[in-house]
């Protein structure tokens, strides 16, 4: 059997700010051989998420940091090419923590999920946008904590991103009025015209507190926060009575490591509001419920997904940096094969 070549990107030093070329190295090794109970997966798409940048810092998080010399962690999708595990057959499509790697080993555990249906018929890009951690995060954050009701006003930051674009559409399906916050006219146009938001505020060019007052005259009932920082503070200043603030991400501080405290947090008390952080991995046992709802809405034509696709493993670091420079709309993917 010819040996398969496996190219991977490993961490060489801790980045400061954006990931620099010398922070990582592209290495070539042999693909691993599956042992009993394991299968070998050839990665087709690597998903690029802002959280992946936080795993490169030597800081405690819900997952341990990537060690120097280790493959950079990322969630991806691929096809089983060899199996010694009863849970997987050759040709199955699987979502797992592929990392920045062309091949990876999976076991029958919570880090790998077979995608139902014949492998060649699976829309892998839709799976990465809707039926993986991204879709589950939008679903559980919006339905479990946000709980939008018909007629309520929902605000979503990073509304043009992978999670935000889906979260806002879930709120629309619930009958809420949805206002996005995004950076730049092109993103704001996509948020309204593609993702179906009622309005979008351009935080780079608009006066945010004034725009929130205009678009949310009765206040904000639900805020789905992906950014933290001054944007979170501005929305906290506009909360309605009994508002729910969903803390999903803090992309504004992932590069700096600084977390300026929101001065308007006192409004949580004044408005008897709730602010709650969450991680979709806590709901792992209910992912099927999320995907069933998302599949139903997708089949009914109620969900739109968009991907920004880079080509080749060499592009992984550029794709990750692109999340922090505002380069991408929708889910960022790198196609490997």
Which residues make up each language-model segment?
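Glycine-rich beta-strand-centered segment in the early N-terminal region that forms part
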Residues: 30-48, 56-100
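Short amphipathic alpha-helix with an adjacent loop that forms part of the alpha/beta core around
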Residues: 207-217
